[in-house]
C-alpha cells in the first residue's frame, strides 16, 4: 500500500513564491472594487477619532525614496489605528505653488516666461502641478497606501486659496503682518526672497580679507597720533559687500588697542585679538601704543578704502572676540544686525545690489558686475591701493538656495513680514501640549521659534497665492480690511487666484469702496508679490483639514527632520498668530533622511539613487513597505539593492511561516477551537509565546516603533516557530488522524498564531497579509473581505501556561539544542542519517529531573528522535546511537513495536490505527 496517500499532507494552494510585482496590481484592483477606504470608514464610524494630517509633498516630480518612506510610515500608523478600533480619515494633499514649478516649466518647455501674460504663465504652472499630482498619486496607490485619493487637497485649489486669504486677513487684523525694508535671504538666480526653511548650507572656498579703513575724523581724541598712519582693521568673508559699508561696529566694553607695526603704521583692533591678527598680517613684532574701550571711538569717522565716502564708528553688543578683529564691517543693506545697528544711529539704508545680484551705480566702477564677479576685482584694487592688511583662503559654510543650489545673498528689499516676536511666547507655550516623537523634538522646535526673526512671507514670483493687499493711489497706503478680504476670498472661491491677475482692482472691491486711510476712491492698485509657499502649507490645517473634515487639531503630523524649520513651524505660527489657537497637532513625529547603503545622500550625480517604481517592478511594494517597517526611521534610513535582497529573505521567512499554517489548516473550522484544558502543553506553549509577541507588538505600535514590530514577528517566526514548534508538530499534523484531538490541538494553535500574526503585520505587509487573510479560514465574527476590517487580537490569556511551566519549556528547549548538536555530530560520523534513526541517552542535572518523569514517547517527539532515555546526573550530556527496531513505512520512526498490529506488518501501532480508521476506497 502507498501510505503517502494516507498522510494529511499540506494542501492550501497558497503559493510559496510571492510573485509580488504581478500579484499586487491584482490586489489593488480588488481593493478598488471593494472601495477599501470608504468601507473602512463605514466600519469604524462612531469610534474614537485618529486624524493624521498629510504634510503635502511638492508636485514637481516623480516619487523618490523619501516620499516612499514618509507615506509608508503614515500608512502604517493609519492602518494600525484602524485595526485597534479608531476612525481614521486620511486626506492626502499636495503643495503646488512656488519657484520649483516655475523653474521646471521654464526649463522643460523653454518658455520665455517674461513675454507671457501672468495668467497664461500661471495656467502652465497649474497644468504642470496637476500632472505630477497624478504621477505621485499613482505611485502612492501602487504602494498600497489607504487614503481618499479621489478628493485630495491642493494648495492651488480655489477653495483652499479662499481660506488661505482669510488666514492672511486674520493675521493682518491681529497686527502680526507688516511691510518693511529689511535684509532678507535673496536668490539672485531666481530673483526672489527666501525663508529660512528654503536655504541650505554648503562648504565653499572663499577669500577672507582684513581691510584697512584710514582714520578720517577722530573727534580730536587721538590728535597726539599721526592720523595719516592710523587705520581701523576690519575682517570679512564677503568682499562684494564692502561697497555697501556704512559703519564699523565695536563692542562698547571691550578694550581696543592702537598697535604700532614695525613699518610705522598704526592699527586699531581688539586688544584680545591683537596677537592673532598681527600674526596673520605677517608681523612678528609690534607695540601696543595705547588702549581704550570701544565706547571711546563712538561716532568717529573712517575713510572707505576704495570709495569716496566715510564709515561711522558705532557700538554693538553682538560684537564678539572669537574671530576677526573686533572691528565689524557693517553694511545695513546686507545684514540683519547691521540693519538694526544703522537704524539705531539714524543712518540711511543703502542697497548697492539689484535683484539679479549685480552692483548698482552706488558701487562706482563695480556697477553692473555680479557679486561673485566683483570679488577678485575688488581684492586686486585693494592690493594696488595698499588698503589690504591681509588675506587668507578658507572654506566656510555658506547659504545656498535649496531649489537652484546656487549661493544666495543677504539683501535689504521691501518685503512683507510676519512679526513673530509679537506671539512668540504663545507659540513656544503651545509646544508643551504636544507629544513629541522623539521627545527632543519639543526642544528643537521651541529653540527654533525662540531664535527666529520675523518671517519674510512675500515672494517676487508669479506662481503663488497673491498677497491680498490693495494700495490707494492717493495716499499710497496698503489696504487690508475685513471688507477687502471677504471680497477677495469670495472671488477666489469662484474663479481661483488667477482672477487677481485678470481683474482690475476696482472690479474686485465692493461697489463704492473708499480708502480707509484717506477716504478717497480715485483708484487702487494690487500688490504684485505672492505669498511664501510655507504660508500655503502652514495654512493646510485650517484651509484643508478643518474645511474638509470638520475637526481641529489633527491627532498627528509626521514628516522629515527638516520640517522643524519648515512645515511644523509654519503650521504652528499660522495656528497661533492667525487663529489664536494652540498647536494644530497633538502629536508630532519625525523621521530621518533616506541615504544609500554607505550612508551618503542620494544624488543623480553620484548615480546612487533608487527609484520606488523600479523596486515595485523588481521586488514588489510589500518589500518597500518592509524596508520602511524594518528600519529605525529616527535616524537616516539606508537603502540599497543588497538591503532589499536581505529583506527578501526575511519576507520569505514570514511567508513560509504563513504557508505552513495555511497548508495545515485545510478543513479546519475555527468555530471549533480546542479548549485550553484539552490542548497539548506544547501547543499551549506556542500560544503563550504568541501572547508575548502580541504584547510586544501592541507596545511597539503605541510607540510607533515599526521596526520593533517587524523584528519581533521575524524572530517569532524563525526562533519559536520554524526552529522549534513547527518541526515538532509535523509528525502530529501529518501522521495522526485527520480529526484526532492531538491534531486539532495543533491546528488550534496554528490558527490562533496565523490569525494574530496576519492582523499584527497587516499595517506593514499590506498586500501579503491581505493575500493570507483571503486564503485562511475565519470565525463567524470576522470580516473575511479584508484583514483591515478586523481589529488586532488581544493575548489569549485562557490558553496561557503558568510561569513555572514556561520555565520548564525553556529547559526543554535547552536540552533539545544540546541533542541537536549531538545529532549533527552523529550524522557527520555516519552513525545515523536522519534524526528519526536515532536513539538518544540524555543525562540531565538535578534541576531538570522532571524530564526523567516525562512520557518517553512524548519526549522523543519533542526531540524528533525515535527513542530516548533520560537519567539524572551531574551535568547535561547526550549520547547518540542507532535506534533499535524497524522503520515504520508511514511515519518513518524506528520502533520495536512496528509490525505488532495484525494486518499491518510495516506500521507502528499509531499509524496502523489511523490507517484502519480510514474509509475503504473501492
Per-range role (PLM):
Residues 42-103, 164, 234-242, 314-341, ...:
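N-terminal catalytic cores of NTP/NDP-binding nucleotidyl/phosphoryl-transfer enzymes
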Residues 184, 398, 467-469, 512, ...:
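Residues immediately within or flanking Cys/His clusters that coordinate Zn2+
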Residues 345-357, 461-463, 485-636:
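Alpha-helical recognition segments enriched in aromatics with Gly/Pro capping
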Residues 2-20, 26, 30-34, 106-243, ...:
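Residue patterns forming the tRNA-binding/recognition surfaces of aminoacyl-tRNA synthetases
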Residues 95, 184, 188, 194-202, ...:
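Acidic, turn-prone loop/beta-hairpin segments
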Residues 187, 401, 472, 515-518, ...:
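Short cysteine-rich clusters marking metal-coordination/redox-active sites
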Residues 247, 254-327, 336-340:
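Protease-associated
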Residues 191, 460, 476, 519, ...:
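Cys/His-coordinated zinc-binding microdomains
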